[in-house]
């Protein structure tokens, strides 16, 4: 039986159902024994500030191309099957889901590594902009040095 391969990218304002996304990764996929997912959510604290929400913006068209390139690199490096990336944009409140990365593979090692790689590169290479609403006002956030360093470890 051949590896089940697919790539799906969704940039959306509406929330997603984690259980449904996992079920779609598993659907008609008897070859892959591993499904690894990451879900990022809006936290209520950042750098000592009380966060009340986020505004996420993106560069339409370019964001999807950037994510497709990141996934293509992951598919070259690891033996993975299906990949799904969902990233929300717009106004998000505390506890809401921001991002989903799901990866299937025959074995867990490839699925874990590819999932982490995709998320690390998404944080620094995909054109998203984040404005944080805090008890001290609103501010646009720059990419963190720690995110840059984490992504560079894959090079």
Regions found by a protein language model. Give the residues of each.
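N-terminal, polar/charged subdomain of small-to-medium soluble alpha/beta proteins
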Residues: 1-97, 113-116, 120-155
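Short glycine-rich or small-residue beta-strand-to-loop segments that form or flank ligand, phosphate
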Residues: 99-105
């Amino acid at each position: 039986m051949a590896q089940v391969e697919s790539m799906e990218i969704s940039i959306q304002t509406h929330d997603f159902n984690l259980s449904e996304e996992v079920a779609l990764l598993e659907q008609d996929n008897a070859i892959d024994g591993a499904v690894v997912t990451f879900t990022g959510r809006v936290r209520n604290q950042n750098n000592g500030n009380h966060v009340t929400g986020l505004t996420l913006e993106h560069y339409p068209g370019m964001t999807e191309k950037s994510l497709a390139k990141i996934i293509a690199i992951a598919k070259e490096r690891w033996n993975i099957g299906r990949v799904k990336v969902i990233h929300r944009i717009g106004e998000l409140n505390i506890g809401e889901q921001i991002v989903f990365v799901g990866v299937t593979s025959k074995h867990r090692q490839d699925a874990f590594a590819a999932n982490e790689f995709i998320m690390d590169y998404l944080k620094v290479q995909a054109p998203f902009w984040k404005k944080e609403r805090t008890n001290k006002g609103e501010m646009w956030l720059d990419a963190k040095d720690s995110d840059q360093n984490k992504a560079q470890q894959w090079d």
